[in-house]
Regions:
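Bacterial Sec-dependent N-terminal signal peptides
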Residues: 1-27
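Charge-biased low-complexity segments
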Residues: 20-177
Length: 177
């Protein structure tokens, strides 16, 4: 009987241990008139985004049917233009001070933008970076500046395919220069 009790206790302990390791740690960070969510995944990767985001963690679907599209990297959702990509990277780079650029040198920032599929305007941003890098020490105001500048300065010309979705999503990794 004693063995069975120990086995049950060990099983409960093991289940609890694994459940804790698989969960995401969520922190709410208050800025000056804005609030961000900081999720730290089990992999120690940080997801940072505005609490008001409505597309974060929402699947990409067709507007008319609500069904998920097949994954196709060749699918053209926006018209090609060199200006938008370059300007998006410029916005990220200019948000960092020279001192901050030195601190994060050699580390990359993941930048996601969510684009309104009717207007082509950036409506949301999300950032990813490893928790144990200098990127985690950058003030929230830097990410807020990137968000606001993206929303105010970046726009896309959508293709007919891009207009079919609830949003258009782009993601890139960028080393700050």
């Amino acid at each position: 009987m004693k063995k069975y009790i120990l086995l049950i206790i060990a099983t409960i302990f093991t289940i609890g241990l694994f459940a804790q390791n698989k969960s995401t740690v969520t922190t709410i960070i208050e800025g000056d008139g804005y609030t961000y969510i900081k999720n730290i995944r089990k992999s120690r990767l940080v997801d940072l985004y505005n609490q008001e985001n409505k597309y974060t963690n929402v699947p990409l679907v067709y507007k008319e049917t609500g069904e998920r599209p097949p994954f196709d990297l060749r699918e053209k959702r926006v018209e090609d233009d060199n200006w938008t990509s370059r300007h998006s990277e410029l916005i990220v780079n200019r948000a960092f001070t020279n001192e901050q650029k030195q601190i994060v040198r050699g580390h990359k920032l993941g930048v996601a933008i969510y684009i309104d599929s009717t207007t082509g305007k950036v409506v949301e941003t999300e950032f990813t970076f490893p928790e144990m890098t200098p990127m985690a020490e950058i003030p929230l105001s830097v990410f807020r500046k990137i968000e606001l500048d993206m929303k105010n300065e970046i726009y896309f010309t959508l293709t007919d395919v891009g207009k079919m979705y609830n949003y258009v999503f782009f993601y890139w990794m960028q080393e700050i220069e």
